[in-house]
Each structure stands twice: as C-alpha cells, then as structure tokens.
Amino acid sequence: MKPAERRKARHLALQAIYQWQLAKDNVADIVEQFKLEQPTKGVDLPYFELLLTGVVNNVTNLDATFSPFLSRKLDDLDQIDKGVLRLACYELTYCKDVPYKVVINEAIELAKAFATDDSHKFVNGVLDKVVKQMGLRQ
C-alpha cells in the first residue's frame, strides 16, 4: 500500500474517531456514512476500517497507554488530541508493520491539520514517552 493512501486513511479515521467520541454512533454506521459522504479516492479503505474499529474496540487499553503521560485528566483533554493519541497508540501497539517514527510523524501531522496551534507539540511529547515506555526506540 502506498504511504499516501495510508495517510488519507488516517485522516478519515481521525474524523470518524472524533465522531464516535462525541456521538458514540455504531462503528459500522460510521464506516458506511464515511464511504458515502467522504471522498475516498486514493484512500486505503481497509486500513481506515481497521484503525477505526481497532481504536473503538481497544479504547480502554489505548487510554491506559498514554494517560500516565498527560499533564491533565483524560476527560479534560481536547477531543481531537484524544483521537490523535488513541489512533497513534493503536498503530504503535497493533500495527507492527508501521515504524514508530512514521506513527509519531503522522500523529504530529494530524494534530497540525485538525487540532489547535500547539497540539502537535503536546502529541509529540506524549507519544515520545509512550514509545520509550514500550521499548520501541532503538
């Protein structure tokens, strides 16, 4: 799969995760809605579905992965930041074919595209600690 197709899948997945976080809609319904309403040309759709369902099905474990490194309570975290961290922690934990540096870079780019001005710095700092804790840094 081309990196650009995965990048687009991450963009869509973050938007879908955001929707799920706010509305708690059924994941299958969100997937269908996104396929109908979002431009999916050049998107790795199976990867999009994997990321969305993976985050939703593992949200408690993912939150436990990054929560110790937050400077505030999880409930006080911006929804986009929370979605980016959940998505990145899912990839770090379950998508072993994706190098951790790629995961962090993609998370930073998502934060720059969708979140507040300094969110990318916050996301980078948290994920740096997660990677260290997971023993992924060489």
UniProtKB/Swiss-Prot annotation:
Q: Which domain of life is it from?
A: Bacteria
Indicate yes or no for the key word Hydrolase.
Answer: no
Keyword set, alphabetical order: RNA-binding, Transcription, Transcription antitermination, Transcription regulation
Q: Which InterPro entries match?
A: NusB-like_sf, NusB_fam, NusB_RsmB_TIM44
UniProt GO MF annotations? RNA binding
Question: What Gene Ontology cellular-component terms does the record carry?
Answer: cytosol
Task: Mention one GO biological process in which this protein takes part, according to its record.
Answer: transcription antitermination
Matching SUPFAM superfamilies:
NusB-like
The answer, when asked if Endoplasmic reticulum is one of the entry's keywords, is: no
Classification via HAMAP family: NusB
Q: What function is annotated for this protein?
A: Involved in transcription antitermination. Required for transcription of ribosomal RNA (rRNA) genes. Binds specifically to the boxA antiterminator sequence of the ribosomal RNA (rrn) operons.
The record's similarity note reads:
Belongs to the NusB family.
Protein name, per record: Transcription antitermination protein NusB
- Which source organism? Tolumonas auensis (strain DSM 9187 / NBRC 110442 / TA 4)
Q: Tell me the lineage of the source organism.
A: Bacteria, Pseudomonadati, Pseudomonadota, Gammaproteobacteria, Aeromonadales
